[in-house]
């Protein structure tokens, strides 16, 4: 079986793409239809049915505003398209995308900085379509300690009390928890208490 045949017979999901970070930067420069012009051909060539787009915010921004603007940019990109891709919130959306040759775009926190320490804001982001939650992007934040690359002996603190509360709410909302970038203690805290699969 060659790669093309394998791809054509498989459900292909890209579980991490910094899509909206890039899209928003390009839209700020005046570009439109960024996804169609810069990504669509590659998605089709790879037979991708679902993209999990991270909501990533760098240190130099207003985290809450930046995450909301990234979601708004996706909404604008969907409106500018002719239905090739759409915001997805459940497995049925992914199956629909696969059956119709479209791409389901799902949203994920890559660090919970946009919640600005307010656990209750997770409910609002869930209503906006966010279904995956990664507690940190390597750097530490109010919810969890990130992984460290320069200090192999660093142990850190895992999840904070706020992080534990956030994890409980994420599970209540049936969000998928992504353990990428979190430190070892946080990884094991999440895994040892897991009641459903994690990424």
Where are the model-predicted features located?
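Histidine/acidic residue-rich metal-binding segments in metalloenzymes
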Residues: 117-127, 131, 149-199
């Amino acid at each position: 079986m060659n790669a093309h045949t394998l791809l054509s017979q498989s459900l292909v999901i890209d579980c991490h793409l910094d899509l909206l970070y890039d899209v928003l930067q390009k839209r700020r420069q005046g570009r439109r239809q960024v996804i169609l012009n810069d990504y669509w051909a590659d998605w089709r060539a790879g037979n991708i049915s679902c993209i999990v787009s991270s909501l990533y915010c760098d240190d130099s921004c207003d985290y809450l505003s930046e995450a909301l603007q990234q979601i708004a940019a996706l909404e604008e990109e969907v409106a500018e398209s002719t239905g090739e891709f759409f915001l997805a919130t459940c497995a049925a959306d992914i199956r629909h995308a696969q059956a119709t040759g479209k791409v389901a775009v799902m949203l994920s926190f890559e660090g919970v900085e946009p919640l600005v320490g307010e656990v209750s804001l997770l409910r609002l982001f869930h209503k906006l379509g966010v279904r995956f939650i990664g507690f940190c992007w390597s750097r530490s934040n109010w919810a969890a300690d990130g992984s460290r690359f320069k200090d192999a002996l660093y142990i850190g603190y895992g999840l904070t009390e706020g992080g534990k509360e956030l994890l409980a709410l994420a599970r209540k909302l049936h969000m998928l928890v992504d353990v990428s970038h979190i430190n070892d203690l946080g990884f094991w805290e999440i895994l040892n208490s897991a009641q459903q699969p994690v990424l």
